[in-house]
């Protein structure tokens, strides 16, 4: 295999790993934000009673 091919493959693999971890972190942040919103909605419902 030529060297430029191996460099392209390695760059693609590194980018894929970064994207994978980025998506995982992004989903966790969204879940945390969603939970905070749920808590606020529950507090509003309780205060309305």
From Swiss-Prot:
Subcellular location: Host membrane
Pfam families hit by this protein: TMEMspv1-c74-12 (PF11044)
Record keyword Transmembrane helix present: yes
Transmembrane segments annotated in the record for this chain: 5-25
GO cellular component terms, semicolon-separated: host cell membrane; membrane
Main localization of the protein described in the UniProt heading: host cell
Record membrane topology: Single-pass membrane protein
Keywords: Host membrane, Membrane, Transmembrane, Transmembrane helix
Family under the similarity heading: Belongs to the plectrovirus ORF12 protein family.
Name the record gives this protein: Uncharacterized protein ORF12
Organism: Spiroplasma virus SpV1-R8A2 B
